[in-house]
Every structure is written in structure tokens, then in C-alpha cells.
Amino acid sequence: HNPETVSTDYDMCDRLYFDELSFERVLDVIDLEQPRGVIVSVGGQIPNNLAMKLHRQSVPVLGTSPISIDRAENRNKFSAMLDQLGIDQPAWQELTSLEDVKGFVGKVGYPVLVRPSYVLSGAAMNVCYDEEELENFLKMAAEVSKEYPVVVSQFLQNTKEIEFDAVAQNGEVVEYAISEHVEFAGVHSGDATLVFPAQKIYFATARRIKKISRQIAKELNISGPFNIQFLARNNEVKVIECNLRASRSFPFVSKVLKRNFIETATRIMLDAPYTQPDKSAFDIDRIGVKASQFSFSRLHKADPVLGVDMSSTGEVGCIGDDFSEALLNAMIATGFRIPRPEKGVMFSSGAMKSKVDLLDASRMLFAKGYKIYATAGTAAFLNAHGVSTEAVFWPDERADAENNVCLLYTSPSPRD
């Protein structure tokens, strides 16, 4: 399907087929090869979506049952399963009219995440913060009707997103990894900066995540890889979704742990023997950070603010003795250049909380000899708190040249 995925190790495969990953083409390959079975859990979302079609054609799907895959992929079935297990999830409804959408929003409040089934133009998903924004999005970008319902979900702000990658056998978790996003929930998992092992989650939160994950694995009788995404705030844990396949973070956590998750998963799916992980293998003295690579600088007038749609064009994974070292390594690997002290750093922050959050960083940079610039409100705040700051107008095409600004820090509001 994607030749680049095997460009460096093409000789590892017995046979390569460069064709579209469609149901018809997969059946053609199956007719030719006559395999013992097929694995659909290591190729992303597209092969996962073929599981039930292959099952109806009596093609043996190795690992987790296609019926279980369908229970996880079908939003209504999965939500009903979570309710049955007593597992919390963000409130959501599938709605067929603007009036119904407004009625649901009246119960849960703004903001809400809107997923249209039929897109007229623009993005497939959008976070709406008020009624005007909601109406404009549904009228301009999507169609709402009985034929084309929209899914509207409660959008939780200032909430941590946590990932649970694991391998299970007959519903029992064999090995797992808990990672956390640096950014708050609302940034696509393909764009978010991932930290493993998780550094800033409560012990009680981690314990609840493990308990919920085991419940889901048992209910779906998972045999193979899976990934569950969680929202967590103040020890309240909600499940976003469960994918019964290897996620994009699978190779990353395997690298950090030095434990090959996908090898274990493959052996389980093939009913082959595998090595049980030692508990000490998960007690590691290193931190991994997976950071995304973006191409905004090459796209004129591209909006660099991240959201629910994926924007990254690549990623890097780095390891350090602690979080700060691993994060710095990852930033440098994505092309970030650390400014020298003789250069200027500029801050632009709207919300008071953001100004307070950057106070320690600005003091440290000032102590290191950096010249501090800021927009009017931010400059007044920093000066009032002992950080000598020069106020400048922004945006200004000449500001970076005249003031020698080599690094701009800005914290846009979610609506910008």
C-alpha cells in the first residue's frame, strides 16, 4: 500500500504487493497466496475497517475477532459497552437537525466537538465555542439531515490525554505502556508530543487506567495489539476510544522499553510461544519523548496552531536521563535552534494564566542574558514582576529584524 514503509528493509518480506489497500485487491492477493489467515491490526485504520468484510467472506482473521473489532469501531456499540461496564466517557449524541444539536449543547455546554458524516468544505471536524460558530460551521462546512447525521461530543478543556498501548492474549493484558501528551486534549494524537513513561499523572489515575483497560480487554477478548485513549482531570478518567490495532506510538514505547511489543503481539496472533515480560523490564531509568515534525515554514501563510485535525508531516523519538533532556533532544531533532543569549526572545500571551505560567521561564532567560521583548500587556505584566522587558508592536514584519528577535513564544486562545 505504501512502498516507503518497506523501503529500508524490503528484503524482510517474502512477497511485496504495490496496490491499493481495498477489499477487492486484498481478496485478489488472498486468492493467489492462499494464506492460513490474515492480520489486520498492523496497517493502520484501513485494514482494520476490512475485518468484518473479510470475516463475511470466511477469510480467517488472526488475533482479535472481527466481531470484537466491530464492537470497538462502531461508536454506538462501543458506547453501549462502556455503559454496561460502568466506564465513563464524554457525553455525545448522533443528531439529525440543527435544533437537536442546540438542544444537546444546552445540556452539556460549550465547547463541543462536531463530527459531520458529510463534509461540504473545509475540515472534517471542528471545535465550536459558541452558538454563532456552531451555526456557521454546520451551514458552511457540513450538511445535517437524517441521511447525514452529525456526532456532537462534549469537549473537555484543560484536560490531560493519556495513551494506553498494550498486548493481550484471550482478554488478559500481557504487557502495556502508559504515555501522556504534553499538550492538553484537543491536539490530534499524531501532532501531540508524547512522553513515556508518563511523568505527570496521579498514581490513582494510573491505577484506574490500568483497571479500565483490563476490563475492556476482557470484554472484547483481545488477542493482539490495542490502544486506548483516555482523558484525565483531577483523577476523573474518561475513555475517548479503543483501537484494536497497533498505534503510531507502539514502536516508540517498544524502543524506550527495549521490549518489542509487536513481536509479542504477532506471536500471540499466530499461537506461537512468546517470552513473558519480567516486571523489572518496566522499571526503567530513561525517559522517551516523541515529537512531531511540521512543515509550516515551507507553506506560506500556513496556520501553525494545532487542533483536532492532524498537521504533522513526520516525527522523531528521543531518549534522555530525564524529561527535560529528552524533550530538548526531541526539539533539536525536529529542527529547533536554541537562541544564543545575545539574541532576543519575544513573548505574546493573552490570558492572565498564560502570563503567570511563563513568568518562571522569562526570569530564567533574563538571568541567562537574553533580551526580553513582549507585546504591550505581557510586557507590563513581566516588568511588574521584575523581568526587564521592552514592549513592541506585533505582528510587525520589521520587529524581528529591528529588535533581533530569534524566538517568539505565543499562547493563542483555543478560538484563534
Locate predicted features:
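A general structural motif
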Residues: F18-F23, D70-N74, F323-N329, S349-K353, ...
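A conserved helix-loop-beta module that forms one wall/lid of the active-site cleft
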Residues: T64-M125, A384-F393
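Periplasmic-binding protein-like
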Residues: R36-V42
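Short hydrophobic/aromatic-enriched beta-strand-loop microsegments
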Residues: Y17-D19, S58-S65, G386-A399
